[in-house]
């Protein structure tokens, strides 16, 4: 994440005592089409990530909210038209009603696509979790965020990072009095690997289920400052109810 206090996968600045951080540091270039649920949120340029959870719905971070968003699916190199992309405007953008921009609690939003996505080898959905994330589970984090812990280098190609879920005790010890029951940590206490600016809103997938949303952190890939993620399991009912009410 940033050398400053930051939000670990955010695209636009947020007026909070954190700095936006939405990139992958210490990862690797994803194999093309290996993360078909990953989307890019665009408002003239990429600013956040997201995850396709049904043909017409995307989940992202609440701090990624903008009034007008184009969702770009099937992307790998976001600077090149590769022929597999689907660009679909948002019809509805619904941030969690209890989203708190100061502490980033309930950092989640849903985006309804104006037309359903075409599901194929390049674009597909990711399952919602059936149980909360267990400590020690290896997860895949992906995004087009900054790849440097100091300075800036934004990749054109989607980046991936394999990282473990940390215990809630280690998460709370890393950020005293800042971790709510709706947050969890993924990463390495020794630093060197993390999400960062530009990754915000993107997926944390563990055992084939969307367990996390890139939310915030202090800097990127700093020692004893792992990335903090929205715990999707806590919002499964809200997601299902919101989709049903807006179908």
Swiss-Prot record:
Uppermost EC category: hydrolase
Swiss-Prot/TrEMBL site (Required for specificity) positions: 194
Principal place of residence: secreted
Presence of keyword Hydrolase: yes
Enzyme Commission no: 3.4.21.4
GO molecular function, one term: metal ion binding
Disulfides per UniProt: 48-64, 139-206, 171-185, 196-220
Catalyzed chemical reaction(s): Preferential cleavage: Arg-|-Xaa, Lys-|-Xaa
Signal peptide range in chain numbering: 1-15
UniProt-listed SMART domains: Tryp_SPc (SM00020)
Annotated keywords: Calcium, Disulfide bond, Hydrolase, Metal-binding, Protease, Secreted, Serine protease, Signal, Zymogen
Tissue: Overexpressed in metastasing in non small cell lung tumors, leading to an enhanced cell migration.
Taxonomy, superkingdom: Eukaryota
Entry-linked SUPFAM superfamilies: Trypsin-like serine proteases
Alphabetical GO biological process terms: endothelial cell migration; proteolysis
Binding site for Ca(2+): 75, 77, 80, 85
Localization of this protein: Secreted
Active-site residue list: 63, 107, 200
Ranges of residues in domain Peptidase S1: 24-244
Chain's role: May regulate cell migration.
Family: Belongs to the peptidase S1 family. Tryptase subfamily.
Name of protein: Putative trypsin-6
Native source species: Homo sapiens
